[in-house]
Amino acid sequence: MSVMKPCLMTIAILMILAQKTPGGLFRSHNGKSREPWNPCELYQGMCRNACREYEIQYLTCPNDQKCCLKLSVKITSSKNVKEDYDSNSNLSVTNSSSYSHI
């Protein structure tokens, strides 16, 4: 029973602090107006209507925009893709380009 009191007290204090913390879970409040939390910013993405060719869509931003993240590798054009046909007329695609990590 004596172990239960400190445990309950710790849980109660943490619950009170979680409710009273300004700015939410990941953002501190510096006297600015409160903005809604944007999960796209956590992944260092940009909210846009359409992603650019070197970006991928990962999440959905507020106002039904797309969260566009930059790719870490550069994708080359499709000119480096070879098409080989076998005797059964099945198409097999081989990518001959090499990717380099930045």
From Swiss-Prot:
* One cellular-component annotation, GO: extracellular region
What Pfam families does its record include?
Answer: Defensin_beta_2
Q: Region Disordered: start and end of each range?
A: 83-102
User: Which compartment or compartments is the protein found in?
Assistant: Secreted
Q: List the disulfide bonds.
A: C40-C67, C47-C61, C51-C68
The reply to whether DNA damage figures as a keyword in the UniProt entry is: no
Signal among keywords: yes
Check the UniProt entry and state the signal peptide residues, or none. 1-23
Q: Where is the composition biased (Low complexity)?
A: 87-102
Which domain of life does the UniProt lineage start with?
Eukaryota
**Which terms are listed as keywords in the entry?**
Antibiotic, Antimicrobial, Defensin, Disulfide bond, Secreted, Signal
InterPro entries membership:
Beta_defensin_dom
User: What is the purpose of this protein?
Assistant: Has antibacterial activity.
**What family name appears in the similarity comment?**
Belongs to the beta-defensin family.
What is this protein called in UniProt?
Answer: Beta-defensin 116
